[in-house]
Swiss-Prot record:
Residues 1-52, 199-305 are annotated as: Disordered. It holds the Pfam family Efg1. One of its GO terms (biological process) is maturation of SSU-rRNA from tricistronic rRNA transcript (SSU-rRNA, 5.8S rRNA, LSU-rRNA). Residues 199-209 have a biased composition (Basic and acidic residues). The gene is efg1. The keyword rRNA processing applies. It is found in: Nucleus, Nucleolus. Residues 270-279 have a biased composition (Polar residues). It comes from the Eukaryota. InterPro entries: Efg1, EFG1_rRNA-proc. GO terms for cellular component: nucleolus; preribosome, small subunit precursor. This is rRNA-processing protein efg1.
Length: 305
């Protein structure tokens, strides 16, 4: 049995196909691929579903600043900076939410108008190749320029803004001709200008100039100075004028000063209690005596007259 060949005996360039030689690691390693970074204006912003989370954070920080009056200065500054950052993040999230809504709303209109502009542009190119007269060539070039702007209008119209249709819907011939000959939307001129400057991508992803915000503006609470609590002063007690009690006994002096005699009150209370008990007992006994008198029958006794 023949021994196995060593790896050093084999010729690597002959074993590997030339088209795959780049994939084989050798003395010269394969250069790493560089990641393409998106432009700053084309990066996707915060997702629309994070709006509620950001609003909750803003509410928490606002309540903290309103209620905690004795916060240290450094903590208050950090909270105010965080609040400003969350407000900016909320504005970006709401703008992205509006952008997604507009894309979904005008997707079909943009698609059909883009297809229509592409078909018309192909027809004009064929006519341009077949035409021979100079005047017709110039006219076709002007029409091609208009259709190229129309095509770019359907592709690079700002996604966050309301899309205005270029072509009239199907209807009567006169209405279609009138609508076709009317002026282009105001955005059409901007698209034409951006074609010359080469800034169509920036136009497509630009933010709307004035967006209607659904959230109320958050105001920072004003810091109130904590005043020390004042201790109320005791009211002066008015003293009654002195009464001359010479020649009076103790009970008279107490009556003069307005002090109730507890002993007399107790006796009166006991008297009233005893009187009510005696009265109830007398009523019961009287009723019994009346019953006995009514039921007494003479039996011819000794004491009867």
């Amino acid at each position: 049995m023949a021994p196995k060949r060593k790896l050093s005996d084999s010729d690597a360039p002959e074993v590997v196909h030339p088209s795959r030689q780049v994939q084989v690691y050798g003395d010269e390693p394969k250069p790493a691929k560089k990641r393409k970074s998106e432009p700053a204006f084309n990066k996707k912003q915060a997702h629309a579903s994070s709006v509620n989370t950001i609003k909750k954070k803003i509410r928490d920080i606002t309540r903290k600043l309103e209620r905690a009056q004795d916060l240290p200065a450094d903590v208050r500054v950090e909270d105010e900076r965080a609040l400003a950052a969350y407000q900016q993040e909320l504005a970006s999230a709401e703008a992205e939410k509006i952008r997604q809504k507009m894309i979904k709303k005008y997707h079909m209109v943009r698609f059909f108008e883009r297809q229509k502009a592409t078909r018309q542009l192909k027809k004009l190119r064929k006519r341009l190749l077949d035409s021979e007269s100079t005047e017709e060539v110039e006219q076709l070039k002007d029409e091609m320029h208009i259709l190229e702007v129309d095509l770019n209008y359907t592709q690079y119209h700002p996604l966050s803004e309301t899309y205005i249709s270029l072509y009239p819907p199907k209807g009567s011939g006169e209405d279609a001709e009138v609508k076709a000959t009317k002026e282009k939307p105001p955005m059409w001129k901007e698209v034409e200008k951006c074609m010359e400057e080469g800034t169509l991508d920036r136009l497509r992803n630009r933010k709307p100039e004035a967006t209607v915000s659904t959230t109320k503006p958050v105001r920072l609470p004003e810091r109130k100075l904590v005043k020390p609590k004042s201790i109320p002063k005791p009211k002066p007690v008015e003293q009654a004028p002195a009464i001359d009690t010479t020649g009076m006994n103790r009970r008279q002096r107490r009556a003069q000063r307005g002090v109730k005699d507890s002993r007399a009150t107790k006796i009166a209370k006991n008297k009233s209690t005893g009187f009510s008990k005696n009265q109830a007992f007398g009523a019961v006994e009287g009723a019994r005596a009346d019953e006995a008198q009514d039921g007494n029958v003479s039996d011819g006794g000794f004491f009867e007259e």
